[in-house]
Amino acid sequence: MVSKSLFLAAAVNLAGVLAQAPRPSLNGNEVISGVLEGKVDTFKGIPFADPPLNDLRFKHPQPFTGSYQGLKANDFSPACMQLDPGNSLTLLDKALGLAKVIPEEFRGPLYDMAKGTVSMNEDCLYLNVFRPAGTKPDAKLPVMVWIYGGAFVYGSSAAYPGNSYVKESINMGQPVVFVSINYRTGPFGFLGGDAITAEGNTNAGLHDQRKGLEWVSDNIANFGGDPDKVMIFGESAGAMSVAHQLIAYGGDNTYNGKKLFHSAILQSGGPLPYHDSSSVGPDISYNRFAQYAGCDTSASANDTLECLRSKSSSVLHDAQNSYDLKDLFGLLPQFLGFGPRPDGNIIPDAAYELFRSGRYAKVPYISGNQEDEGTAFAPVALNATTTPHVKKWLQYIFYDASEASIDRVLSLYPQTLSVGSPFRTGILNALTPQFKRVAAILSDMLFQSPRRVMLSATKDVNRWTYLSTHLHNLVPFLGTFHGNELIFQFNVNIGPANSYLRYFISFANHHDPNVGTNLLQWDQYTDEGKEMLEIHMTDNVMRTDDYRIEGISNFETDVNLYG
């Protein structure tokens, strides 16, 4: 039998916890409650749009029309419907034996981030707020808004809790509010083809992000954040999303007469040189999705779209997971099956052209890459073991390219093992005779060239760039691989964690990564000096952004190789 004194002690303790639970108000008098997690107040699963269900499936998000009163913002919401990320991990496992090549302390966090920790549901347009415990509404703290990656086919804000950023910002004396936003991916968020284009509902996932930013503008002051000091940042598809938010509506990032964001960080991603939303690539993706869902693709485009809207979530989830991974990561034109595309609306023109013509939001930014971005993707081309195989693969990706353009790529990226990726490893790490070559091509095509396009086109804003090499010679076959930096930002506080957290927190506060970090001075990028920070495991150095000039420039300038 539980004693009366123990019961009273437990009751007093519970009352203390409840008394500490943060309780901000929204819409004037609608009170929500969060959870105190050590030094951090957390508010998880706050709706920012109406559920995109039934007739709203595949459509742009609508403003939230419900009430927040009494919302217990204790738990993350479900993730949006998506590809099972375990499939891609299985592919990498088969190709590389991840358990053997990735250090144990990294493997668990990497798998957790990829697989996610929450269920899936079409009712998924929620966001999360993390702030220093006890922050008052008038604190006006800088706001860091995180947009997750996942190749535009998977991802969830639940995989990226903001506690580490908020705690480090407190330690630095530069406190921030951290916000993470869910958005629809795959066909639910980036369905292309004639029908969805004609309907005017392309790039729904980008609109989800925008709607989340509008919510931040309207409401973050209630949590102690400053709507006039918002930084957007993300990794991989999240960074690509940031790039497309910069060029959205031709660079108009205003809402109700005020800027939605004031600075940006792009980690391993930039503008995508895609064809428009009704071109061959999205049309193939649309038709395959419809076929896998049991819809008649020989019917009218509108009838097929209505068929897709009539299907259950589980049927569409199965359809999305019916794609061969090679369809999504390598054998659909222009590499990615889903993602932001020019539509004459939110993306009014080709992404590169928007940057080069000055039609982008004029805010300071940081953009950087991991040294070996392509190694995690190269297994999709494991069967390409000869130069003719690689040529055929490139011809399918760049379906508009001339044979001369393809041959030039092959000449700039030869089979020579010592120049492939993982870079600077000589003849080692050659999983197949063409693996390092394909990895180098993918690294520069998808990640390095978009970064340099942005840097060269944005001379009228302050910008910084970096290259991370901290896993060099530590992870066989992968090197400093795509996505590894997330482990250091959200899971493991070792090695380069301080560099990412401190530089980025300083940037959110001051639009300068160098204030109060106790780290190496990071010089701004200039066209003349091409200054670049190189992030190591325990220290950093300044270097010049001058590697693989000819190969990367070719991807920037050959119009046959981009949209």
Curated annotation (Swiss-Prot):
Glycosylation positions in this chain: N302, N383
Cysteines joined through disulfide linkages: C80-C124, C295-C307
Signal peptide (UniProt feature, chain positions): 1-19
CDD domains according to UniProt: Esterase_lipase
One GO biological process term: lipid catabolic process
Any single Pfam family the record assigns to this protein: COesterase
InterPro entries per record: AB_hydrolase_fold, CarbesteraseB, Carboxylesterase_B_AS, Carboxylesterase_B_CS, Type-B_Carboxylest/Lipase
Keywords, ordered alphabetically: Disulfide bond, Glycoprotein, Hydrolase, Lipid degradation, Lipid metabolism, Pyrrolidone carboxylic acid, Secreted, Signal
Entry-annotated residues carrying Pyrrolidone carboxylic acid: Q20
Record GO terms (molecular function): triacylglycerol lipase activity
Reactions this protein catalyses: a triacylglycerol + H2O = a diacylglycerol + a fatty acid + H(+)
EC numbers on record: 3.1.1.3
Known function: Hydrolyzes all ester bonds in triglyceride and displays a high affinity for triolein. For unsaturated substrates having long fatty acyl chains (C18:2 cis-9, cis-12 and C18:3 cis-9, cis-12, cis-15) GCL I shows higher specific activity than GCL II, whereas GCL II shows higher specific activity against saturated substrates having short fatty acid chains (C8, C10, C12 and C14).
Recorded family membership: Belongs to the type-B carboxylesterase/lipase family.
Oligomeric and partner information: Monomer.
Protein's UniProt name: Lipase 2
Gene name of the record: LIP2
